[in-house]
Amino acid sequence: MSSSRDEFVYMAKLAEQAERYEEMVDFMEKVVTAADGGEELTIEERNLLSVAYKNVIGARRASWRIISSIEQKEESRGNEDHVTSIKTYRSKIESELTSICNGILKLLDSNLIRAASTGDSKVFYLKMKGDYHRYLAEFKTGAERKEAAENTLSSYKSAQDIANAELAPTHPIRLGLALNFSVFYYEILNSPDRACNLAKQAFDEAIAELDTLGEESYKDSTLIMQLLRDNLTLWTSDMQDEGTEEMKEVAKPDNEEH
């Protein structure tokens, strides 16, 4: 590994400690570029990349949800002037979301997926590709939303095929994929039955093999299993009585694997 690549990794860790996530993204993009000879990222590097983008996108997703909620309230009150201002502001956030998603999707397509050689790294990156297409589908409309949803489905399905063939049901990356795939069915495709079936199957298969779970991934796997169960409880009650509580999804890669 080149010394410049080591330096970028170190700077990314510094940026993470300082909670300067935009700069963390920049440093991790340089790590990917430094490994461009077809060399795969280490597990630590790919987790740092995921944390960087997750924080940068997470802040904007939260902003978008808050602004959209205010917009609905102002519309219901008939405050047209306010609604116009809010729409302009929401568009600014959506431009940032689009730019961030396009940035990581480009890295995934041009470098990361192609260089992945192991089952867990292939699933990790394909899941990531699905996640960022899903984030686009959250706010896009019309044909753009349809395209983002189709890309999400295709990425998650590719990841699922590899996960089912190569990763144990208790593997945290396989569980994290099932968690986010089920959220996609529920939130984007409005298919609560499919969401519940996927989440329940993943949970049941993991429970059946819980005694084989190694100590190193026990904490990560059981955390995601708890999120799967929480969502199942929430969705089942929502199907009987529409709730407003937000879905749980994997927030950080260290909730998925070491």
Swiss-Prot record:
Gene Ontology BP, a term: signal transduction
Alphabetical list of InterPro entries matching this protein: 14-3-3 (IPR000308), 14-3-3_CS (IPR023409), 14-3-3_dom_sf (IPR036815), 14-3-3_domain (IPR023410)
GO CC annotations on file: cytoplasm
Name recorded for this polypeptide: 14-3-3-like protein F
Family in the record: Belongs to the 14-3-3 family.
